[in-house]
Amino acid sequence: MYKYVIWDFDGTVFDTYPHSSKVFKEELEKYGIYEDFETVDSLSKVSFGHLCTYLLNKYPDFTREKYAAIGKINREDEPGKVFAFPGAKELCEDIVKAGGENWMYSHRGPTAKTLMKEAGMLDLFKDFVLDGDGFPWKPAPDAVLALLERNNADKKDAIMVGDREIDCGSGYNAGIDSCLFMATSYENTRSKYQATNFDELRKIIFGEVK
């Protein structure tokens, strides 16, 4: 069993992309930018930075400040509308019951804890690295290494779980195993494992898959 499970938030534990893509599409239209839902959704699933770069390159009048303003609107609209994936809470509970620990590593800020508390999941997580904690973004290994160090954890006992290659990249670069989970594509990944649902992920975490 992997004793330390490092989770990504968006698209991994919480089903946030449908809501955020809808909000971004609607708010972009207020700036005269018309992109279809599928484009916004697919770009954000690579990374929100990828979406921002796409918009900045395509629309000369679009700015990072406008992007940040839309992000703020999205976050403020999430409570009561964004929920954990079915099976996420149960798996996190079983990890704790088996003597393991859940950690969170997300580019999201304090709203991660707000939504986790709303879902009754906050107490299932022992440690967090969130936006604003001063670490370079994924796939840099710094945050993963810091989590391991401050919890006195052995690398062989830890796994990074995320829906994007940058999540797995941060684990790979830190020297730990990773699982690409519920991803839009499983090609060209550095992850040791791939899983399409929580039942498959459970088997990986609990050592039933080698």
Regions found by a protein language model. Give the residues of each.
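Asp-based, Mg2+/Mn2+-dependent phosphohydrolase catalytic module
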Residues: 1-3, 93-96, 100, 109-210
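N-terminal helical cap/lid subdomain that shapes the substrate entry/recognition surface
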Residues: 2-90, 94-98
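Generic detector of contiguous secondary-structure segments
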Residues: 10, 107-110
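Conserved SAM-binding loop
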Residues: 13, 84, 104, 160-161, ...
